[in-house]
Amino acid sequence: MATVTKSIGTSSRDYSTIAAWEADLDSSSIYSSGDDAVGELYNDSVFVEDIDIDGGGSIGLDTITLTSSDTEGNRHRGIKNSGPIVRHNSASRDFIEVAGNATVDSVTISFIEFDGDDDSVSNGDDKHCIKYTGATELYFQNNLLHSWGSGQDA
């Protein structure tokens, strides 16, 4: 099937938040069964939000990818503040949660800087920096992850 790429950012993008893009992963007006959904972050804003990827199953997506655009100057260079940044929004929940399902083959998260915002609030053993559940394969690659407080589980 098709690869459907949507831009995420503030300057003339398809979506202004990651949550809005994720909410449309089950939209039949955008995707068809077997499609590969790609959300591309742009370095024109800091995304202050927690990520929860659990869509795409009812429409039958093949893969889901959240990455930064590969346009020149947009991807991080292995150092802080050199590409799209997602900053932890809530000390009361997991920062990145992927709840896969049997119909989506894989979820890939790549080339993004994740800033825990120095969250040192302990919320017990049930809060994580990255939480993964489900049957979907998860690939977390070429990301920067920093400032995750000592009170949280990694």
What is each of the regions a protein language model found here?
Residues 67, 104-116, 136-149, 154:
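Right-handed parallel beta-helix
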Residues 50-52, 89-100, 120-133, 151-154:
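Extracellular beta-strand/beta-solenoid scaffold signature
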Residues 37-40, 65, 112, 128-129, ...:
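Short Gly/Ser/Thr-biased coil->beta-strand turn/linker motifs
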Residues 3-41:
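Acidic Gly/Asp/Thr-rich repetitive segments characteristic of extracellular carbohydrate-active
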Residues 35-37, 49, 62-64, 94, ...:
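The right-handed parallel beta-helix/beta-solenoid scaffold, focusing on the short coil/turn
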Residues 73-91, 115-123, 147-152:
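Acidic/polar low-complexity surface segments
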Residues 11-14, 33-64, 68-74:
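N-terminal extracellular ligand-recognition/capping segment immediately after the signal peptide
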Residues 18-32, 47-58, 77, 97-100, ...:
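Short, T/G/N/S-enriched strand-turn elements that build extracellular solenoid repeat scaffolds
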